[in-house]
């Protein structure tokens, strides 16, 4: 059962602890509605002690956006969950900041989620990234040219703040769960338009690889990600130890304009290139 798989992921990565307050980013789409419903059910069925809030942002990009906002608000009202909504003009913000619409939307969402976290005194923010999102990210990193760090993909938990309970769940499982629970999530039709790189990877590249090379490409890249993560963790420990041995003086202050690190140059020059880069 999907809820059991999600609970296993939560337990494995220690995402949620007793007494946590969690802000869930909910768009109204299949992923976030699956996450919201699952966390409600997991809490009730397992008698877990955590509080849920919902944060929804209306980007003002599509005519369907207001309907999606009402859908999320109605669902939350039905389930007695406090829902925070913000409406913005992302296109306008993107132009003002001279960045892409996708980047502007992402920055806006995360800023809003943290705002609600502070307002509700919550300590976790749950994001509905799934296994397919992780695989797409890794492929995008490879296309752009990445080091081994880019092969790790999306982290299950970051800074002990952002948690991703669906990170081991495939999109097809999420869609089935939504159907079984009669959630009727809202579908963003722009996800099927091959305008952005991610959409092209999702709609064109992965189906082609599945058909022509490996039907289990999602599992294969997930395996690559897990191996890369273990290797990165080991390498980071190694680099930290070497750094300590090379360090002569360190003066780091977040408030200061000029920070200073002094290393033993002779020892530094004896290190392998991969250590120097790190």
Q: What name fits each language-model region?
A:
Residues 1-26, 30-206:
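Core alpha/beta nucleotide-donor-binding catalytic domains of modification enzymes
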Residues 196-278:
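ATP/NTP-dependent adenylation/nucleotidyl-transfer catalytic domains that generate, transfer
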